[in-house]
Amino acid sequence: MNYDFLIVGQGITGSIVALQLKKNSKKFKLIEGGSPNTSSKVAAGIVHPISLKRCNLSWRGREFYEFSDSFYKEINFESDTELYKPYKLIRIFASFEEQNNWIGKTNNEIYKHILSLNSKKIDSLKNRFGSGIVEICSRLSVNEFLDFVSSSFLKSKVLIKDVFKAHELKLKNNRFHYKGDIYSNIIMCDGVNALKNPMFNYLPIIPNKGELLKVFSTFLPTKIINCGIF
């Protein structure tokens, strides 16, 4: 069978690429090995246009946020589930310098609808320098989103649950041949697994190691709180 694309990896990137190809009526297959430990599966899913460390608007940040906002709202509609919803992000200032920088930005025409000062006390938090609010912020329930995409593409027989084997990929007449099918293009969305791929193992990728602490409490705030970490 002939296809326009083969997508390797069904994390956040692979899922979005697949949905965009579907929207543009492209013929494709999506392959996912099902590893339990991937960066997508532990991602916080927080979306906003600000680089918090420097309190700067990211490059084309407003444009990218608006695109993401529209895209994920469509996913809410298609899934009939609120996988994506708006939040306020509270930034705890680490110094008077950061506080002054934030105050200055709130008076700037570019930032005045994005950043504001938080005048309310946050219970149980050390907050001696005060805090600010990122008004334009949302959060995606990443694992639920990935499950929705997986379920949808399994039903349409687009998704293949298998480990991609790079040594079985052959290039003939400017077409990629893989397990009996022919693809015009391949998009690799397999993250750190690129280190195992002879086509990309020269890239200076350094795997990250991290730990998660899950807390279940009826007293947790409904806002996102950031002070270097979330």
Outline where the language-model segments fall.
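Dinucleotide-binding Rossmann-like beta1-alpha1 core, especially the glycine-rich loop
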Residues: 45-128
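Helical element adjacent to the flavin cofactor pocket in flavoenzyme catalytic cores
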Residues: 132-185, 189-194
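Hydrophobic anchor at the start of a short beta-strand
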Residues: 5, 27-29, 131, 186
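Extreme N-terminal leader/targeting segments of oxidoreductases
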Residues: 1-4, 23, 143
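Beta1/beta-strand and adjacent pyrophosphate-binding region of the FAD-binding site
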Residues: 1-13
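Glycine-rich FAD pyrophosphate-binding loop
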Residues: 22-41
